[in-house]
Amino acid sequence: MLSASVERVGNTSVVHCAGQIVVGEGLSALRDTVLCELDKHTIFLDLSRVDRIDAGGLGLLVFLHTSVNGLGTALKLLSPSAQVTEVLKLTKLDSVFTLYPAADTDSELLHSAGEPYEASA
């Protein structure tokens, strides 16, 4: 099961995800949650508590990346879990998405874009 909650400050939103990003009802709920944030300059997807992602989940991330960026909003992945990072690397999608390490606090992240990092194996 996938859950998502949103935190907003200024022109930035953080969508905190927990559970599994896999084919099923959770994907459309996550899609709708992210697309409701299009009025923001930057949307971070916090993937630190995602323990599994499948091809359907990857497809959703690519769809969101393309859709959101095409409308002038940046979509960035925040602190992907080890499993998500491994899948992103295996599929070479780590070169498509901007990955950010965890911020010390969410407010720190929301007030600055942070520094992207290279995903390590």
Describe the function of each predicted region.
Residues M1-R52, F63-A121:
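STAS-like cytosolic regulatory interaction modules
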